[in-house]
């Protein structure tokens, strides 16, 4: 078995391997850090490489923390019945992973989101690492596995739901019975797919 396979097996169920202790010590530092922070190298090298990461110029890895659970809605100031306040049990039509990708893209407007993966969670928040690519960098333009990102059609991928997590949230990972309202898009079918 290769080194990547050992790492992959350890991360499958972190609670049953050495990853549990690593995460426990790492999260103590992560909680004190800003919500979006650039990291020198990926925490999960196997997953990062599987999703397109290479240790070369023009590629950046960012760790993003996002709150867990449903949407945090402000309480209305004027009087209302408690049943009609609409504060609790309100969920976004978007996964937390997509929110993490969008925040990373907003922090680094000159970079495009390639992909992202989970690295940890506690009772309050989840952490994702987002792979970002500089589409104007010469080493990216000359690399066949990345230069498709240089086209204008891939601008703002994260906010348009064109990443892997975005397509999953839009229902484009599935086909057949039950997905009639998913294509061409959710909005084209008056949001009946959601």
UniProtKB/Swiss-Prot annotation:
InterPro entries: Rbsml_eL15_core_dom_sf, Ribosomal_eL15, Ribosomal_eL15_arc, Ribosomal_eL15_CS, Ribosomal_uL23/eL15/eS24_sf. Disulfide bonds: none annotated. Keywords: Ribonucleoprotein, Ribosomal protein. SMART domains: Ribosomal_L15e. PROSITE patterns: RIBOSOMAL_L15E. One of its GO terms (cellular component) is cytosolic large ribosomal subunit. Residues 160-194 are annotated as: Disordered. One of its GO terms (molecular function) is RNA binding. It comes from the Archaea. NCBIfam families: PRK04243.1 (NF003269). Belongs to the eukaryotic ribosomal protein eL15 family. This is Large ribosomal subunit protein eL15. The lineage of its organism: Archaea, Methanobacteriati, Methanobacteriota, Methanomada group, Methanococci. The gene is rpl15e.
């Amino acid at each position: 078995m290769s080194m990547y396979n050992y790492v992959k097996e350890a991360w499958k169920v972190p609670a049953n391997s050495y990853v549990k202790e690593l995460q426990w010590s790492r999260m103590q530092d992560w909680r004190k850090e800003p919500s979006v922070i650039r990291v020198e190298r990926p925490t999960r090298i196997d997953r990062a490489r599987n999703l397109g990461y290479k240790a070369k110029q023009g590629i950046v890895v960012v760790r993003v923390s996002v709150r867990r659970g449903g949407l945090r809605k402000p309480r209305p100031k004027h009087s209302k019945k408690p049943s009609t306040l609409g504060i609790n049990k309100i969920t976004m039509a978007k996964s937390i992973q997509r929110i993490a990708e969008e925040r990373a893209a907003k922090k680094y407007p000159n970079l495009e989101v390639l992909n992202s993966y989970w690295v940890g969670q506690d009772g309050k928040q989840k952490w994702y690492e987002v792979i970002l690519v500089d589409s104007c960098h010469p080493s990216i333009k000359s690399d066949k596995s990345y230069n498709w990102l240089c086209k204008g059609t891939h601008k703002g991928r994260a906010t348009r739901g064109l990443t892997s997590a975005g397509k999953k949230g839009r229902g484009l990972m599935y086909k057949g019975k039950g997905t009639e309202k998913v294509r061409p898009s959710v909005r084209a079918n008056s949001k009946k797919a959601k």
